[in-house]
């Protein structure tokens, strides 16, 4: 494990030592053993890294459509290393997270937004869309949270914070409201509105996954941190409803989703293209996944 991940693992242990959280269905107390905690933290980071690698061959290639079942997706024991060696930018989902994790390691759990923004602004790794504009804004003197505000960042509703909010949930086991608070400090550096809601929702699901293995419960419970009047909440609620209506046919749900929610103006590069980078439409794919095959959709 890399030095960064070791630091992060230790942080998680200190943060939730002797965890006892009443968050599950029956409001019963939930206690995590150190071994269970360690396994879940490692699994969270491994899952994120493997997910980036698995999506590498198809990213931005099947726009506005599904990947047909007969399309093979190559995978072997060398896949992760090959992608990292040839296109490390594929892992922006991971290295942006680690930038914020290092701020917590240096400044503590009460680190202010300026500390995160400064660290993010000093990075030199590849960035795109909301992240790229946010870093440019910071370097031009536009401070957070204005760096992510939609009037200053035309990509504010893009998927950026959604793919890098994992850390907030990983370090808030069983505490989705705490995950949302971390997102409030960090997420507005590059995102606003739906772009921010996507990150909060992902973080909340990570948080709840520490104390429940019930996917339906996690998906529904995490949605409570999102305002009901928002389009984001309405879209996710639709997907939950369609999945209940077509439990064995995720493709039918996908078509319903496209029919109602695929018109987006959230990304300047994608306004006239089937670009698939709007936050709502991407996160909804989590919901229509079959529990054992989420990466295939």
Give residue spans per PLM region.
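Active-site-surrounding "flap" and adjacent substrate/cofactor-binding loops of secreted or lumenal enzymes
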Residues: 57-88, 94-97, 114-120, 124
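Bacterial N-terminal signal peptides
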Residues: 8-18
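Bacterial N-terminal signal peptides that target proteins for export
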Residues: 1-7
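Amphipathic alpha-helical interface segments
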Residues: 100, 119-229, 237-241, 263-264, ...
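Single conserved hydrophobic/aromatic residue that forms the stacking wall/gate
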Residues: 286-297
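Mature N-terminal segment immediately following signal peptide/propeptide cleavage
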Residues: 32-55
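Bacterial Sec-dependent signal peptides at the C-terminal "C-region" and cleavage site
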Residues: 16-28
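Small-residue-rich helix-loop
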Residues: 232-263
